[in-house]
Amino acid sequence: MKIGNREFQTKGHTYVMGILNVTPDSFSDGGKWNDRDRALKHVEEMIAEGMDIVDIGGESTRPWGYTLLSDEEEIARVVPMIEAVKANFDIPISLDTYKSGVAEAGILAGADLINDIWGLKYDNRMAEVIAKSGLPCCLMHNRKEADYRDFMQDVAADLAD
């Protein structure tokens, strides 16, 4: 599978996705990488440590107490960072978003992959936007309520939908 200008083998190899949250309220690193220069230094460090893809996210999706952003607010966070990373490094860029408008803006800015934590279930335009772009996507499982009877069966059923 081609992501950006790199070929990724889909069998028998593990890849490392480094996370660059440009949010003030991320549960893991809130606010650390909002500054462009600090963020680029962090990307440089992650590349040196073996990162294969950088995943840029502009809205916290922690399990509790995060702020939902408008498309415009999220775009204002991620697009400048996508452009800065693209201009400074030869590394595939993943955009972590579940909103089609943000995905469109990120694709125009140079994102190479869309990482949708809602597995195309939040925004009914997302599949169309990704398909039209020709980019690969990473689909994840998520639920608003963690009401699992049999976790593995429930996750498999959700992903099959």
Label the predicted regions.
Residues M1-P24:
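N-terminal amphipathic alpha-helix/helix-capping segment at the start of soluble metabolic enzymes
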Residues K11-V16, M51-D52, A87-I91, G110-D112, ...:
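Short, well-ordered coil/turn segments that N-cap beta-strands
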Residues L20, M46, G50, D96, ...:
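Conserved, mostly hydrophobic/aromatic
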Residues L20-N21, I93-G101, G119-L120:
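Glycine-rich beta-to-alpha transition loops that act as phosphate-gripper elements at the mouths
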Residues V22-K41, P92-S94, K144-D154:
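Active-site mouth loops of central-metabolism enzymes
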Residues P24-S26, T61-G65, A109, I117-D161:
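Conserved anion-binding
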Residues K41-G57:
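Catalytic domains of carbohydrate-active enzymes, especially glycoside hydrolases
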Residues G65-L95, E104, E128-C138, N142, ...:
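Alpha-helix-loop-beta-strand connector modules within alpha/beta enzyme cores
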